[in-house]
């Protein structure tokens, strides 16, 4: 149980982020979830309230350094020092490299990777002072195996893994762990938009013969956030139905 530990989950409006926020809340965490808009923040606040979870939603653009700093200050004031950070916010801008525009590359690296640097850096001091903390980064199977048309996304997600291993070595002596969860193909709004042929092709690559559920990812995050994972750091937990085995 997480016993009132303040948890920040970015990109928590729906899908994987929402499932993580709800699961950590059920485990006893106080949950601060972020969205890109005030409407999204209200959505987060509403579902936390409906589930009987203590916490709130906050509007935050992870690419705006000043806004990120102000939001974390607001979370600290309203909820307390952040003990668990889940870097989940992410976007896609798929294109073949020959056709990729600079902004498609830059948008992905900024949102998916630089935000992890920015948020992790800001939560470190209170975690170091408390001599405990958990940073959990949501990467992707694509960051390990690659995918045509996603050089930008794969680079960002692979970068998250390298970042996490390096930071784990820097701050392990302060009892702060840094780990990744790497989802495979998950049943979300994006995969539901695929036609039957595309879905069948995806499922054909997965030994468990189904798409993952958002709850599968939330359960992995809850494990890494909880006491059972106190001796786990610098690891990447693959949750992909056997699509990638290492």
Where do the PLM segments sit?
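Substrate-binding pocket helix/loop in short-chain dehydrogenase/reductase
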Residues: 96-97, 101-109, 191, 202
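Conserved glycine-rich cofactor-binding loop
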Residues: 6, 13-15
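Conserved glycine-rich Rossmann-like NAD(P)H-binding loop of the short-chain dehydrogenase/reductase
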Residues: 27-44
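Residue(s) in the substrate-gating loop at a strand-loop-helix junction
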Residues: 140
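Short, small/polar-rich loop/turn modules that mediate ligand/substrate recognition or access, typified
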Residues: 172, 177, 232-234, 240
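Active-site helix of classical SDR
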Residues: 120, 156, 164
């Amino acid at each position: 149980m997480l016993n009132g530990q303040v948890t920040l989950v970015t990109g928590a409006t729906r899908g994987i982020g929402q499932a993580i926020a709800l699961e950590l809340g059920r485990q006893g965490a106080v949950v601060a979830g972020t969205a890109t808009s005030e409407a999204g923040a209200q959505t987060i606040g509403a579902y936390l309230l409906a589930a009987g979870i203590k916490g709130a939603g906050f509007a935050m653009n992870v690419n705006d350094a000043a806004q990120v700093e102000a939001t974390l200050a607001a979370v600290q004031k309203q909820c307390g020092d952040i003990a668990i950070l889940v870097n989940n916010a992410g976007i896609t801008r798929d294109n073949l490299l020959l056709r990729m525009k600079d902004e498609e590359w830059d948008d992905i690296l900024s949102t998916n990777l630089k935000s992890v640097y920015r948020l992790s850096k800001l939560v470190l001091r209170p975690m170091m002072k408390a001599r405990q903390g958990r940073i959990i980064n949501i990467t992707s199977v694509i960051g390990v195996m690659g995918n045509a048309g996603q050089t930008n996304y794969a680079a960002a997600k692979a970068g998250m893994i390298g970042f996490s291993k390096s930071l784990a070595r820097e701050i392990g002596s302060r009892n702060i762990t840094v780990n990744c969860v790497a989802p495979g193909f998950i049943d979300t709004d994006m995969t539901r938009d695929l036609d039957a042929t595309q879905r069948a092709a995806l499922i054909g690559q997965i030994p468990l013969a189904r798409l993952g559920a958002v709850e599968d990812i939330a359960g992995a995050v809850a494990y890494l956030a909880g006491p059972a994972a106190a001796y786990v750091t610098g690891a990447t937990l693959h949750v992909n139905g056997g699509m990638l085995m290492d």
